[in-house]
Each structure stands twice: as C-alpha cells, then as structure tokens.
Amino acid sequence: MNIVLSYIGPLPEYTIDCIKQIRLFNTTSPIYLILDDIESQYIKQLEQYNVTLISYETVKHQDFLNLFETNKKQFSILEDLGVRKFLFMRSIERFFLLFNLMQQRSLTDVLFMEIDNTIYDDPSLWLEEFSQNDLCFMFDNEYRFSSGIFYTKTANSLIPLIICVFTNARKHICWYSDMIMLYELWDTNFSNNISLLPTHTSFVSSEHEFFQNGISQKIPLNILTYMNYGKFGDTIFDAAGMGVYLFGCDPCHSKGVIIHNNSEKTWSHIKYSQYEYKWERDSKNRNIPYINFGDGKWIRINNLHIHSKDLKSALSI
C-alpha cells in the first residue's frame, strides 16, 4: 500500500498530526505528500516520519487548471477564507495531482487521505478488501459523498473520475466540490467496481433515485451507509459526521470557536450525535474510538474526519 496526502497552500501544522497518527499504526508503507509550500517551517518535523515530499510543480495538471480558469464561478472562490479561498477547487484538483503522481511513479493500491483525518488502525489491513474494487469512498448525504478515506487501485481507476469532472464542471452554477463530484461519479458508475465504505451497521432512511444508462433505479440511502458493513470486521469509517460531532466543525462555521460534542451541525445524512461513544486503549496504549448504535455493541471507528482541524485532540497518544 502507498499513502498519499495533498495540500496546496501554506502547509498547516495539523499535517504533522495527521502523519504522526498514520505512523502510530503503520511504520512501513510509503507516504507521499504533495505540496507547493516547499519552504514550510514544518518540513523538518516531517522528516522523522519518512515522508516523500512531492513538489506541486512536478504533478500539476494543466488541463484541469485550464478548466478552472474558464469556469471559476462554478468552483466558488471564497474570499472570506483568505489563503484557503480556493478550497473547493483544490478539493477536486488533488485527484488530478494524484493521477499524475501515480503515473509518474507507477504507484498502485493508493490510500488517498484528506489531511484533516486521523486513522485508528493499520490501513494495510484494509487493503485486501479495498483491492477488490477500483475505487472506494464514503456516502455522507444525498448528493454528497466523502473522500476523507479514498482508495484507488491504479491511475487508470481514476479516469472515470477525471472524465466526470470535465463533463460536469461547466454545468454547475456554483459550489462544485469533491463531495458533489463523487456523488456524480457514483450516480453514473455505481455498478462499475466502486465500493462504498461502511459508515453505519444498519440505518433506516429515504430512497434516492440514481440513473444508470438513462434508466431510473431507486436505492434506499440506508443501504449506502451499511451495504459493506462486515467486510472490515466490526468496524466502520467516518465520512464526516462523527468527527464533526466529537471535535467540532471548521471554526469558519462557528465564529472562530471550536465546540466539541456539538450536535447543532448535522450536515451528514445520519445524526451521529444521537449515539454513544467511548475511547479505549489497545495493547500498545493507543487510544481508539468506538461507537454504540443503541444495541449494546461497541463498533471500532477506523478514522475520524476532524473538520475543526483540531487533530491534536484526536490523537491516540
């Protein structure tokens, strides 16, 4: 397995926390970090984790940049976010950077993580199930899928995604993001070797109408949350809802304040604040999160999407 991260812009300090957490559970898999802030003050600290730094200039995708230049309104540039104003564009561009990196280095079996995620198991243990598919990611809500934890078998596995972006980007009025992109990819390719990681053990919810080759197919949204539960043992993944509840949302949504255990932000289809949580130390004294869905069974959480960027509070050691 190869692990790839990407951040374009001033490298945030929590990058160190993300990679430190990965190395707590996996000391051998190569980690690649795509960045343009090659003079970052945090580079020296990253060296201890055996990270290969990839300059943005060596993997940037000019065709995507041309698409962005001619369709800026669709990507919603958020001036209020300052240096993060290209958030939505970067959220999609990173898949093009990944594609170029995988081609250049002949990488396969890639775990592509968002930097504001913390993992709580060795991701190489997921590879046997991951590799049964071309792509793996998560359902979060209607019209929104999550790539906090994202797997791709080969560079060619990303081609349907790239085609999807070039096909659909111009159609959007605004707010085109990676979550919408993945929904559209699933909407047109959901029977074509894409797997959704389990984010629940069972859940009752409404139906959603997908179209496959122009033919309507209604799929209950609950199936998208647990259709693959059990393939990773008694564990689930976090698309966003658990991390948002436990460690807060991005301070830009809460007047600059990080609020833990906040049930007000419920962007996810599932309201995870209704469930019970606990942390337990494993045999190596690493703190691991668990969730109880009300049936008395504690389910291990493989990752948390720390939307607030307060990764330090979510570290295992």
Give the ranges of each region predicted by the language model:
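Surface-exposed cleft-lining segments at the edges of enzyme active sites
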Residues: 81-87
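GT-A fold catalytic core of metal-dependent nucleotide-sugar glycosyltransferases
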Residues: 90-136
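Conserved catalytic core of nucleotide-sugar-dependent glycosyltransferases
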Residues: 120-184
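N-terminal anchoring/stem segment of glycosyltransferases
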Residues: 1-80, 103, 154-160, 278-317
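Catalytic core and acceptor-binding pocket of nucleotide-sugar-dependent glycosyltransferases
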Residues: 159-317
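Non-transmembrane alpha-helical segments in soluble domains
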Residues: 19, 23, 99, 182-187
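Conserved glycosyltransferase catalytic-site signature
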Residues: 88-95, 175-180
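Secondary-structure boundary elements
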Residues: 25-28, 100-111, 130-132, 153-158, ...
